[in-house]
């Protein structure tokens, strides 16, 4: 399940980046 792991990692990274972006944009 390499593809699943890569997809999950990308999803997690994207979600974290989105949270950081929202934190910066809400300023």
UniProtKB/Swiss-Prot annotation:
Listed transmembrane segments: 1-13
Ranges of the Stromal topological domain: 14-27
Membrane topology reported for the UniProt record: Single-pass membrane protein
Main location: plastid
Protein name, per record: Photosystem II reaction center protein Y
Chain's gene name: psbY
Signal peptide region: none
A GO term, aspect molecular function: manganese ion binding
InterPro entries tied to this protein: PSII_PsbY (IPR009388)
GO biological processes: photosynthesis
Domain of life the protein comes from: Eukaryota
Localisation per UniProt entry: Plastid, Chloroplast thylakoid membrane
Similarity comment: Belongs to the PsbY family.
GO cellular component, one term: photosystem II
Keywords for this protein: Chloroplast, Membrane, Photosynthesis, Photosystem II, Plastid, Thylakoid, Transmembrane, Transmembrane helix
